[in-house]
UniProtKB/Swiss-Prot annotation:
Organism: Pyrobaculum neutrophilum (strain DSM 2338 / JCM 9278 / NBRC 100436 / V24Sta) (Thermoproteus neutrophilus)
Reactions the enzyme catalyzes: 2-(N(omega)-L-arginino)succinate = fumarate + L-arginine
Keywords per UniProt: Amino-acid biosynthesis, Arginine biosynthesis, Cytoplasm, Lyase
GO biological process, alphabetically ordered: arginine biosynthetic process via ornithine; L-arginine biosynthetic process
Family recorded in the similarity comment: Belongs to the lyase 1 family. Argininosuccinate lyase subfamily.
Annotated SUPFAM superfamilies: L-aspartase-like
GO cellular component: cytosol
Entries under Pfam families matching the protein: Lyase_1
InterPro entries documented for this protein: Argininosuccinate_lyase (IPR009049), Fumarase/histidase_N (IPR024083), Fumarate_lyase_fam (IPR000362), Fumarate_lyase_N (IPR022761), L-Aspartase-like (IPR008948)
Transmembrane portions of the chain: none
UniProt name for this protein: Argininosuccinate lyase
Compartments where located: Cytoplasm
Length: 429
């Protein structure tokens, strides 16, 4: 029988298994231990608990093996940790740890710290991807290809320009993460179950001891809100949704019907009956898991939206969706980066398509307008010539020499990629 509800009785194994979060708590067990140590040290600081008891608990916490806490007989890791401490130190010593705390504020704190840790892992993966993108963009700065709009050949660009578009997406994602990280760095400790603690907890001090940089002011909001989780998961899933568009391009370009991309052998599989097949399975899985992450985001919102402002056990069920989103993102970015490092691009074939499918038509019409012909007149004249097979278009290399910042001009691509690589060299990952 679980520790906290032992005085109630009536618990069966079926119910315990059904309501326990112990398996999911593997994601936060280290943070739970860290927060407990900060809590007991602070109790001693303010004279709310005997110093000797706090020191004994802190020493035991430094010796605990987290995996030993993850046993199915408990409701959650908080209960498992307290029972472990009581068994090890006795109630006269370990019995003080419940003062001034609730599972509500402590689990919110643990989730914030674990989310901050996992966000750091994801950020490093994205930064490394950006460096690979910049390196390959510089390599392919002059590699002409058609862009695609409506899945039709469109304006001529270079593959380097395309890769820098993915890099800019990654940069914007990291920018969006900054204010979300500020939310994660605020501590709910001392908020108690909903209205604060009777013990003289200095919330700023215990926040600092636990590794936070500020506090969530209102105790009800601090213990019961999961806005920080919604914000983080939303940002990550938005990034995955956008990144999966690029992944989809690479899957299409890997088809021999297009033939732009040669995928590395380590990223392809074959058919059990058609031995000629080279299926880009890693990116197919990425695409599917990005969709799965979107489902986790919807589930997270659905769980949170109708439970009132205070804590309910529904929130326990919400947290696993946050971990799923973060884990899917970190693993997917790592795999995609490996693909980007090892793939090759057929510049000759891409250039031939850019020439074949009128990808310099807009530049040709603009060039005529810049020489004094009203643009729409030049546009319709060129349209007639294309229809009649008599169009004389600007050569691809000349069309690419567009003067605008951020264009597909190879010199602009080299400038942007080189600037990013300077950052990569200054901050090696």
């Amino acid at each position: 029988m679980s520790f906290y509800r032992s005085w109630i009785g009536g618990e069966g194994e079926l119910v315990r298994r059904y309501t326990s979060s112990i398996r999911d708590d593997a994601e936060i067990v280290e943070e739970v231990v860290k927060i407990m140590e900060a809590h007991v040290r602070h109790l001693a600081e303010v004279g709310a608990a005997p110093k000797e008891a706090a020191e004994a608990v802190a020493k035991a916490l430094r010796e605990v093996e987290p995996e030993r806490l993850l046993t199915s007989e408990f409701e959650d890791v908080h209960e498992a940790l307290e029972k472990w401490l009581v068994d090890r130190l006795g109630e006269e010593v370990a019995g003080w740890i419940g003062l001034g705390r609730s599972r509500n504020d402590h689990v919110a704190a643990a989730i914030r710290l674990a989310a901050l840790r996992k966000t750091g892992v994801l950020k490093k993966a994205v930064e490394r991807m950006r460096c690979v993108l910049a390196k390959r963009a510089l390599e392919y700065a002059d590699c002409a290809m058609p862009s695609f709009t409506h899945f039709q050949p469109a304006q001529a660009i270079t593959f380097g320009h395309y890769l820098l578009a993915v890099d800019e997406l990654a940069g914007e994602f990291l920018h969006v993460l900054k204010p979300v990280e500020e939310l994660l760095k605020r501590s709910p400790l001392g908020a108690g179950p909903a209205g604060g603690a009777r013990a003289p907890i200095d919330r700023e001090r215990v926040a600092k001891l636990a590794g936070f940089e500020g506090v969530v002011e209102n105790a009800l909001y601090a213990s019961g809100s999961r806005f920080f989780a919604l914000a983080l998961a939303s940002a990550v899933v938005s990034f995955l949704v956008e990144l999966s568009r690029a992944v989809d391009d690479f899957i299409r370009w890997n088809s021999p019907l297009v033939g732009y991309v040669a995928a590395p052998d380590s990223h392809v599989s074959t058919s059990s009956i058609m031995p000629h097949k080279r299926n880009l399975v890693t990116l197919e899985v990425f695409r599917a898991r990005a969709a799965e992450a979107l489902g986790h985001l919807a589930a997270l919102h659905a769980v949170v939206m109708k439970i009132g402002m205070g804590y309910s056990l529904d929130l326990q069920e919400a947290t696993r969706h946050l971990w799923a989103v973060l884990n899917i993102a970190s693993e997917g970015v790592e795999v995609f980066t490996d693909f980007l490092e090892k793939m090759s691009f057929d510049c000759g074939r891409a250039r031939r398509d850019a020439e074949r499918y009128y990808s310099t038509s807009s530049d040709t019409a603009e060039e005529a307008a810049l020489r004094g012909v009203p643009f729409r007149r030049a546009y319709f004249q060129l349209a007639r010539e294309i229809r009649e097979g008599a169009a004389r278009l600007l050569p691809v290399d000349e069309a690419l020499r567009r003067p605008t910042r951020g264009s597909a001009n190879p010199e602009e691509v080299k400038r942007a990629a080189s600037a990013r690589l300077v950052f990569c060299r200054e901050k090696p990952l």
